[in-house]
């Protein structure tokens, strides 16, 4: 049976790079949130600086995820799926903005539960250096990223219900490590949790 694996973490932790490498190794379909659909593109415009009510943005993320889940379920019929961000990003980022957890859970009620979530950790200053070359999104400020990092740890230490992945969470620290070392650590951790994932 094909597996659904999600990569999470603060901006600049190396999620996208590692998610793509793992997807390639597993012959999986790589996907991401926000998606590149119409709603996802609207979200990216807002993150780049357009004005939007925080609850409206939360609803847009949830609407984008409805379409994403449909695609994920279709893709899982033929291959593993690896996603760069998923519902956990919404929970952590939106709770950090002061949106109630109950509201976030309710609007994401249909979200498919992943088999495994890989949380990549990184020193905040190193993350900022990695992001220097990018255009800054509204969420990429140091103090905010610090709260996001805390939010992820609070989530994985308390989530034992609705969005608990089948094989749980794994945490990998990427600080001061080369890409290939991080990749090997992630792959070993995934295989340890799901031994039959590599055929």
Curated annotation (Swiss-Prot):
GO terms for biological process, alphabetical: dTDP biosynthetic process; dTTP biosynthetic process; dUDP biosynthetic process
Family stated for the protein in its record: Belongs to the thymidylate kinase family.
Keywords in alphabetical order: ATP-binding, Kinase, Nucleotide biosynthesis, Nucleotide-binding, Transferase
Any one GO CC term of the record: cytoplasm
Alphabetized Gene3D superfamilies for the sequence: P-loop containing nucleotide triphosphate hydrolases
Gene Ontology molecular-function annotations: ATP binding; dTMP kinase activity
PROSITE patterns: THYMIDYLATE_KINASE
Organism of provenance: Methanococcus maripaludis (strain DSM 14266 / JCM 13030 / NBRC 101832 / S2 / LL)
Protein known as: Probable thymidylate kinase
Pfam families tied to this protein: Thymidylate_kin
Binding site for ATP: 9-16
Catalytic activity: dTMP + ATP = dTDP + ADP
Enzyme class: transferase
Record has Repeat as a keyword: no
UniProt EC number: 2.7.4.9
